[in-house]
Amino acid sequence: MACILFVIELYEKQLILYILYRMIMNYLFPNYLDNEYKGKKIPLYFFYVIIPVTIIRSFIHLFAPDGGAQSIANIPLYLYSNQGSDTIVHLFSEWGLSQFLFGLLYIVVLIKYKSLIPLMYLFLVIEYSTRVLLAFYKPVVLEGYAPGGIANYFLVPLFVILFILSLKKHR
C-alpha cells in the first residue's frame, strides 16, 4: 500500500512539474510569434531602457580607441605588449559588435515580436549570471573596479525578477 501511495505521490509531483514546465515553455516559445506581450508591465517598460543602454555600450566598445578596455573596464593595457593590448582591444570591439546585434534584436522584439520578451529576459539572466561566474573562474587583472563588473551583481537578481514578472499574466 505504501508503495502505491509513493508511486501516486511521485506521479502527482511529476505532473505538477510537467504542467509548470509546459506553462513556462509556452511563454518562452509561443506557438505563434506575435506582438502581444502577456506579462506584467514593469518588464516591458524596463525593456525600453535595456535597448539604448545595450546600443550605447556597443558603440563604446566598437569605436573608443581602447574599446573601453582601459578607460572604462580598468584593464591596464600598458602592462601588455603592443600585440597583446591590440588583441584585447580587438576582442572588446568584437564584443561591441555582438552587443550591437543584440540591441537590434531587442528592437525587433519590441516592435514586432513582444511575445518573445520573456525569452530575452532569460537570455539576459544567463548572460549576466555567467559574467559573474566568469569573474571567479577566469579573473582579469584590473587597476580598479570595472563598473560593469560591479553592476552585474545587481543586474542578475533584477533580471531574474523581471524574467519572472514577464511570465506572469497581466490582468
Q: What are the language-model segments listed below?
A:
Residues 41-64:
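N-terminal signal-anchor transmembrane alpha helix
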Residues 72-107:
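Core segments of alpha-helical transmembrane spans in multipass integral membrane proteins
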Residues 103-118:
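Juxtamembrane helix-break-helix junctions at the cytosolic face
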Residues 119-136:
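Hydrophobic alpha-helical membrane segments
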Residues 142-154:
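Non-cytosolic membrane-interface motifs at loop->transmembrane helix junctions
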Residues 157-171:
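Membrane-water interface at the C-terminal end of transmembrane alpha helices
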